[in-house]
């Protein structure tokens, strides 16, 4: 992975200036491997992150067969693109995307193919996804939801209580909900 978080605690990433991460096969651009929460923030309001996963990896979240969970975005301009089978933000191939929260910032999340924009990778569920602020654009890959489940999987407990949200599923996938 271009950057991988590890350990038992929480990880906070403060965005300053322009940042780009691109990973190779089976890895997320920003790969979350720590047990605690991963928070992406931009207190100075001048930061951006462009994270691109390789084949089977999420843009931000899990690598191949890895879950993308406990991810919070509070600010910044964040663009996340998963590789084929990976979510933009959430699970890698076969990985669930759960406990994902957006409270602010400008977030664009796209899957290469078969993963959700925000939620599960291909064959991964998207659970407990909450958006309460910011501007969020989420586009799922073929057969996957914009926000929710990847290909052949479900989207559950998705809450939108604020912000501006655009969610488009790929071919045969829901905008918000499950994949084909």
Q: Each PLM stretch: what is its role?
A:
Residues 1-180:
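A composition-driven surface/loop motif
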């Amino acid at each position: 992975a271009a950057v991988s978080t590890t350990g038992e605690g929480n990880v906070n990433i403060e965005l300053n200036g322009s940042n780009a991460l691109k990973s190779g096969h089976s890895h997320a651009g920003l790969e979350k491997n720590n047990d605690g929460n991963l928070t992406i923030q931009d207190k100075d309001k001048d930061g951006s992150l462009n994270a691109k996963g390789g084949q089977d990896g999420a843009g931000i979240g899990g690598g191949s067969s890895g879950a993308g969970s406990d991810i919070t975005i509070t600010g910044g301009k964040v663009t996340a693109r998963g590789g084929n089978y990976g979510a933009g933000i959430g699970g890698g191939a076969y990985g669930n995307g759960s406990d994902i929260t957006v409270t602010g910032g400008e977030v664009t999340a796209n899957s290469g193919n078969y993963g959700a924009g925000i939620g599960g990778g291909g064959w991964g569920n998207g659970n407990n996804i909450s958006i309460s602020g910011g501007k969020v654009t989420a586009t799922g890959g073929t057969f996957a939801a914009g926000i929710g489940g990847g290909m052949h999987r479900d989207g559950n407990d998705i809450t939108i209580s604020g912000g501006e949200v655009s969610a488009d599923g790929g071919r045969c996938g829901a905008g918000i909900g499950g994949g084909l």
